[in-house]
Amino acid sequence: MSALTPASEVILRHSDEFLSRRVLFAGDLQDTLPAQFEAASVRVHCNQYHHWQQMAKPLGDNAQYSLVADAELVADSDTLIYYWPKSKQEAEFQLCNLLSLLPVGAEIFVVGENRSGVRSAETVLSDFVELVKIDSARRCGLYHGRIDKQASFTLDDWWDEYVTEGVTVKTLPGIFSRDGLDPGSRLLLSTFEPHMKGKVLDIACGAGVLASVLAKQSPKIRLTLSDVSAAAVESSNATLAANALEGSVIASNVYSDIDGRFDMIVSNPPFHDGLQTSLQAVEMLIRGAVTHLPIGGQLRIVANAFLPYPALLDAAFGSHEVLAQTGRFKVYQATVGRPPRTGKGRRR
């Protein structure tokens, strides 16, 4: 069994409870417990593409990646195990969706690390479920209840938007900087000149703000956007449509589903996976960039100044430059150079 998160270890303390149940897993899944879980049936709803990739092979069609759960996936389940995410709004969105599909009488278990804010589950679900805390271990809480009332869920009710740099940005719960342009992205955008050309890939695109602002400034660029988050994919498509921009939006774990080369790769990459600090995605972004850029192609990213990206950039590209910086952020650029010539040298 792969390493389990503290939340999953708490669930396993109650494993006998689930042997005869038809279980649906959802929320901030960080391990492969559902693929090895003993129950009458197991289904998983993932809204993070890299989480779904771990589940798809062992569970097949019983693992689904999407923004909202499919009614057929949920219909046969009598028990929901929900992993609380760090974003309360995201939890409200997902649980409202799931509780609109699960029948009255279905049981729900909510688990999460104390620092995630899982304590607020009782309040969030109070209109539909009376939750009771049944376990506390590994700095996690586990809550249990029975659905008394179905929720009403309409996706249109959950959209927000803001305007920045002349671009209307459409956002959903769980999106980074949902309420406005963050300082790091603003610094990154300040380094671009208008009237660029070529193919641009925006990785970890969020609501699509970077790509959309660049396309407004440089209408001749061709856009590809990618993210692991189903909410980000949906938001980016909506942002492009709201601004009459064209582009391809792809669910991808960094480069897992990206083909071809690009003239520039841009990103404000995350350095957390859920609550955990993780540089894995950034390392994949930097190391993989050289295979998706031609000679002269550029990777341009913004990051918190304390993060160890210079060494990663130098290892992958040979060198890098800092285009802009503040006390908190730095914008790095690395360019693919020509490989050194091999052979015996020039003929005289």
Swiss-Prot record:
It catalyses: guanosine(1207) in 16S rRNA + S-adenosyl-L-methionine = N(2)-methylguanosine(1207) in 16S rRNA + S-adenosyl-L-homocysteine + H(+). The lineage of its organism: Bacteria, Pseudomonadati, Pseudomonadota, Gammaproteobacteria, Enterobacterales. It comes from the Bacteria. Belongs to the methyltransferase superfamily. RsmC family. Monomer. This is Ribosomal RNA small subunit methyltransferase C. Keywords: Cytoplasm, Methyltransferase, rRNA processing, S-adenosyl-L-methionine, Transferase. Disulfide bonds: none annotated. It comes from Pectobacterium atrosepticum (strain SCRI 1043 / ATCC BAA-672). It holds the Pfam family MTS. PANTHER family: RIBOSOMAL RNA SMALL SUBUNIT METHYLTRANSFERASE C. SUPFAM superfamilies: S-adenosyl-L-methionine-dependent methyltransferases. InterPro entries: DNA_methylase_N6_adenine_CS, Mtase_sm_N, rRNA_ssu_MeTfrase_C, RsmC/RlmG, SAM-dependent_MTases_sf, Small_mtfrase_dom. It is found in: Cytoplasm. One of its GO terms (molecular function) is nucleic acid binding. Its main location: cytoplasm. The gene is rsmC. Specifically methylates the guanine in position 1207 of 16S rRNA in the 30S particle. Its EC number is 2.1.1.172. GO terms for cellular component: cytoplasm.
